[in-house]
């Protein structure tokens, strides 16, 4: 065997080992890192599936956005401000969120707020998907899937 062949084989094996396991076109799945959650301009809900609550948060005219700080999360999109805490460890996240304002909203927006809180107040398998912009996919053990896209920092 030539030295060129011997050098090519380890490089090929390294390339195969570094290939992501996510579906085609989906990019690489990373463990959730608090720095990645915090260092964005927020996270916008792009899809929700898996039940009635997921349907309610996708109602027309409603766009949920979350922002993370160290251990705290805030969200809005229906009508009210939502605040709470979260923990992230490896590929798991857990939320404890409540509605903190009681605005006079239309029924569909109130339902969306309640449904969003209901969807988030649990533990999820969490995946940070590349390439940029990052996407955060939360999959509940009960089957609901929420996907958020990171927004650029605004100065």
Segment roles from a protein language model:
Residues 8-17:
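Bacterial N-terminal signal peptides
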Residues 18-155:
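Lipid interaction determinants
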Residues 1-9:
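Bacterial N-terminal signal peptides that target proteins for export
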């Amino acid at each position: 065997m030539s030295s060129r062949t011997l050098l090519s084989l380890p490089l090929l094996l390294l390339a195969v080992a570094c290939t992501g396991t996510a579906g085609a076109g989906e990019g690489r799945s990373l463990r959730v890192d608090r720095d990645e959650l915090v260092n964005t301009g927020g996270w916008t809900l792009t899809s929700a599936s898996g039940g009635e609550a997921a349907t309610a948060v996708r109602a027309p005219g409603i766009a949920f956005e979350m922002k993370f700080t160290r251990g705290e999360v805030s969200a809005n999109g229906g009508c009210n401000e939502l605040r709470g805490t979260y923990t992230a460890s490896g590929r798991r996240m857990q939320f404890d969120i409540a509605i903190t304002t009681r605005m006079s909203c239309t029924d569909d927006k109130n339902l969306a707020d309640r449904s969003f809180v209901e969807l988030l107040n649990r533990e999820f398998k969490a995946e940070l998907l590349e390439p940029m912009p990052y996407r955060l996919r939360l999959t509940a053990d009960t089957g609901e899937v929420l996907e958020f896209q990171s927004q650029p920092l605004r100065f």
